[in-house]
Amino acid sequence: MPVSLTYLGIDPGLTATGWGVIGISGSRLTHIANGTITSNARLSLAERLVQIEAGLVQVIHEHAPDAAAVEQAFVARDASAALKLGQARAIALLVSARAGLAVAEYAPNHVKKSVVGAGHADKSQIRLMVEMLLPGAKAGSEHAADALALAICHAHSGSANERIAAALLRAGAGR
């Protein structure tokens, strides 16, 4: 019987952080849940980061993933926007690591190539392929679709030994 694992994909952003949880058993992928954590633009940066942190803690607590995949930052022309994205990414990395998850990072083009087959796929192509690979899945937002794509990419990238080791760790930890 194949080992079953759960992966969390996180598409970080200050305004909207997408998340998606998938299961993998052998080569079979299943959709578990997805959503978007939004922060209130009227709050201070620190308070908005706390909102993202609280949302991710809740997702991890509810779904108990075995590993997480976080999108790497792309180079933005707006330095201020790049810094804010970096801070949201730091929250995603910190929350995942603090929960004891193995955390992988993937460049956007790598995720697109892994899921769609083309490194420069657009958002509609990503959503379409995610919904094809995860029957019954309906991504609630572009951010959630991107997060599901990250989880799928991680499922495709992980070796069987990593999957087995993660499952054994999970079983030993009594999760």
UniProtKB/Swiss-Prot annotation:
Keywords: Cytoplasm, DNA damage, DNA recombination, DNA repair, DNA-binding, Endonuclease, Hydrolase, Magnesium, Metal-binding, Nuclease. It comes from the Bacteria. GO terms for molecular function: crossover junction DNA endonuclease activity; DNA binding; magnesium ion binding. The active site is at D11, E71, H143. Gene3D superfamilies: Ribonuclease H-like superfamily/Ribonuclease H. Homodimer which binds Holliday junction (HJ) DNA. The HJ becomes 2-fold symmetrical on binding to RuvC with unstacked arms; it has a different conformation from HJ DNA in complex with RuvA. In the full resolvosome a probable DNA-RuvA(4)-RuvB(12)-RuvC(2) complex forms which resolves the HJ. This is Crossover junction endodeoxyribonuclease RuvC. It comes from Parvibaculum lavamentivorans (strain DS-1 / DSM 13023 / NCIMB 13966). The lineage of its organism: Bacteria, Pseudomonadati, Pseudomonadota, Alphaproteobacteria, Hyphomicrobiales. The gene is ruvC.
